Amino acid sequence: MNQRAPSKYGTQVIKPDDFDIFWGELLERSHNIPLNASLTLDSMRTTEQVEVFEVHYDSLNSLRVVGWYCLPRLKPRPLPARVFYPGYISEPTLPKAHAEQGYATFGAAPRGKLRSNLQFNPGYPGLLTHNLVDRQSYAYQGFYLDAIRVIDFLTEQPEVDSERIGIQGSSQGGALTLVAAALRPQVKAASAGAPYLTGVVDAIDLTRTYPYEEINDYLRLHPQYRDAMVKTWNYYDCINFADRIQCPIIVYIGLQDDVCPPETAYPLMDKIQSPEKKLYAYDGHGHDANHHVHDQVVDTFFDNHLKT
């Protein structure tokens, strides 16, 4: 069915010489911020099988970020853990079903998402272009760090086996998965679907679909900022994080995806350094990336890497 040749496309993304220095400094800043994590039992959502907690923790620029933390009541400790990162227009999940399968689970809500949007809310559309031409204050800086601090939270929980943490998400959640896998070696397995924020300078030429069209809208209004936008994005593009990913990882895409073009996944896979990596490319599928079938592949992947 596919008439494109996404595996032949390549990328225009360039990794800045000071990329590792830039992120090293940000990680140090983040490390120096105490988590100050608090857990509040959610009695309404707690069941006989799963305890549900609303978690609050501190992140960059003193923002208090929120997430859902689910624990199976009857499974032996310490538990393997799975983190679920949200998409761009979707809200955080409450992953009780996976907790019932024997995992400690965390539904992340980085700044701007539900329950973390009173502190920071550029709206939709808006996050993608918020301070787009300034790498030091670009919106995704805090967003990425909020996401990786979930890993820090989990490693501090006595009921979690810090050697068995997996992370996952699709679209923007796939991007956050890639960044967290790159910046947190505690991650032992990762699954990224239809990864967003990957090959961004390529994607804005390949699609006219939102959210990427937000950037094209911005550049139509401010064409003089294109070079500055590209320079900023090179510090945030997932392709430039990929060579730091060492854990087992699966990536899945739809070959007819007009939201996150499949062409951007191939240079990403080329850069990932993990000795155990696999790309699933589904013909006949768009941004859904065949997740209704692939979800079982993901569950099996995590069971194999985190439960054995």
Locations of regions flagged by a protein language model:
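Gly/Ser-rich "nucleophile elbow"/oxyanion-hole loop immediately N-terminal to the catalytic nucleophile
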Residues: 128-171
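Acidic catalytic loop of the alpha/beta-hydrolase fold
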Residues: 255-260, 288
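Histidine-bearing beta->alpha loop at or near hydrolase active sites
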Residues: 279-290, 297, 301
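N-terminal targeting or regulatory segments adjacent to alpha/beta-hydrolase or S9 domains
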Residues: 1-50, 308
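Cap/lid segment of the alpha/beta-hydrolase catalytic domain
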Residues: 93-145, 202-203, 209
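Hydrolase active-site cap/lid region
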Residues: 178-224
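Short beta-strand element of the alpha/beta-hydrolase
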Residues: 67-73, 77-88
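Short beta-strand/loop motif that positions the catalytic acidic residue
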Residues: 245, 251-253, 257
